[in-house]
Amino acid sequence: MDLWQLLLTLAVAGSSDAFSGSEATPAFLVRASQSLQILYPVLETNSSGNPKFTKCRSPELETFSCHWTDGANHSLQSPGSVQMFYIRRDIQEWKECPDYVSAGENSCYFNSSYTSVWTPYCIKLTSNGGIVDHKCFSVEDIVQPDPPVGLNWTLLNISLTEIHADILVKWEPPPNTDVKMGWIILEYELHYKELNETQWKMMDPLMVTSVPMYSLRLDKEYEVRVRTRQRNTEKYGKFSEVLLITFPQMNPSACEEDFQFPWFLIIIFGILGLAVTLYLLIFSKQQRIKMLILPPVPVPKIKGIDPDLLKEGKLEEVNTILAIHDNYKHEFYNDDSWVEFIELDIDDPDEKTEGSDTDRLLSNDHEKSLNIFGAKDDDSGRTSCYEPDILEADFHVSDMCDGTSEVAQPQRLKGEADISCLDQKNQNNSPSNDAAPASQQPSVILVEENKPRPLLIGGTESTHQAVHTQLSNPSSLANIDFYAQVSDITPAGNVVLSPGQKNKTGNPQCDTHPEVVTPCQANFIVDNAYFCEVDAKKYIALAPHVEAESHVEPSFNQEDIYITTESLTTTAGRSGTAEHVPSSEIPVPDYTSIHIVQSPQGLVLNATALPLPDKEFLSSCGYVSTDQLNKIMP
């Protein structure tokens, strides 16, 4: 037996290099355990009924104890039959357990004198001289602290509903651990549950000795326990005593179980019901919703016009309806310049012989008034409205009024002037000559009061007879301005006429001597011609020198012969002042714009303020008919 102990001692001494250093690793302990098993093969198996180690534990890293079980063999249960030996690096031999009593039955207690930290230990159990169990460890690996002590709790607050509460649980570390000095660092783990539950709820590990617990129900009781372990290890110590938490009795109505209303189900069913309602609403109002989302395209509709007329293409009827309104004019644009839309009636040559523009303007004939306002526009709009473009056929004789015609054909013009004077004498002697102008006189009523009044053109038969008598008197014509030219058309559609100047009363006569007759007199026999300004001046300047014994007014055989009123009045005024005394007759107000169209035969003219006597009325280039020229020329 002593030999075997010697061999074991040698083996431990030979492996002492594995325990060199300040600490031993588990690998070294495993190798030491394997060496012991080689030396003692009987330790490999623990025969049934033999004692064995259950655990070795150090509560504070200063002391430790080891425990084992009783063997089934009754011979091993007798006191002293089982012994425990230990060995460590600094001791070269096996030593028996120093204390079998302090740690309890079947245990061995090592106080601080026999405990070395970071030093590997190997222990063995022997019975009747034979080894029954063995184990190797290090003290820091078997640390299992004692449970915390002094658990208690503190109420933090209660919810406004008096249903939930918050508490703070506190405890103290194990009294035998030197936590304050930092010899050991502990981690705590708290478990809690309701009183009637079996499953504990665990909180995360903490390194403090207090932890708050939130939202605990006041009508419940809770159990709390705490355990601890050394930091960076996995083995916890025992749990502390269970702490029972009971809240003070509150208002019974507040402590009652709050009703768990099934909000989730209500929300689900509400959404489903809303979806079904929307589906039924859309299905029942499908057409109306379709019209709201996609409204139909409105049909073309003009107030006062039947849409069927537009569909059937009856544009003439539509234009007739639109013509009723003032802001609509057929085939005209209100925004365009009126100069570009001046119309001259030159399509029908037969109408040129029916009368002058003055006769057409003042005539009772409905067709002539319509032709004036609805004539075709052959003017390009580039020239002045006061210089109308007339066909060359209408001016084949009036062209002689220019300077070149006077130089090239003086003899021919002189002969034609003689013929003109003879024709005028014959016309003056004939009785029909006096009645013809009277029948062609337009019906004009001049109303003169203290304030301007409208001038009515085209009235009833009574007014026609009165005006006929007035216009037949040559003396009355001296104070009446004739409106023979449309000088402007306002954007509202009003026609602005250009008045002529008042002329001196007198009866011009044509002399039979051919040497005093100007070539321009021959132009009066031309149809649809205009008197040029140069020829008119020459004619009027030479007219006072004609002998007065004939007393025959110059006859203008054609109605549509015009001269410019500006040149006519200027020249006539100069010649009249040389031979006659200025007339003292009261001037008649000018009527230069159309006030309203009463009927196709009636126009109401607006009277304007009388011009100053000394101010010369400068009118645009106007045209005077032959009848007016015969009556107002000196």
From Swiss-Prot:
Signal sequence extent: 1-18
Keywords, ordered alphabetically: Cell membrane, Disulfide bond, Endocytosis, Glycoprotein, Membrane, Phosphoprotein, Receptor, Secreted, Signal, Transmembrane, Transmembrane helix, Ubl conjugation
Region (Required for JAK2 binding): 290-375
GO CC terms: cytosol; external side of plasma membrane; extracellular region; growth hormone receptor complex; membrane
Database matches in InterPro entries: FN3_dom, FN3_sf, GHBP, Growth/epo_recpt_lig-bind, Ig-like_fold, Long_hematopoietin_rcpt_CS
Keyword Transcription annotated: no
Residue numbers on the Cytoplasmic membrane side: 285-634
Family membership noted in the UniProt record: Belongs to the type I cytokine receptor family. Type 1 subfamily.
Entry's free-text remark on domains: The WSXWS motif appears to be necessary for proper protein folding and thereby efficient intracellular transport and cell-surface receptor binding. The box 1 motif is required for JAK interaction and/or activation.
PANTHER family noted in UniProt: CYTOKINE RECEPTOR, INTERLEUKIN 5 RECEPTOR SUBUNIT ALPHA
Name of this protein: Growth hormone receptor
Gene: GHR
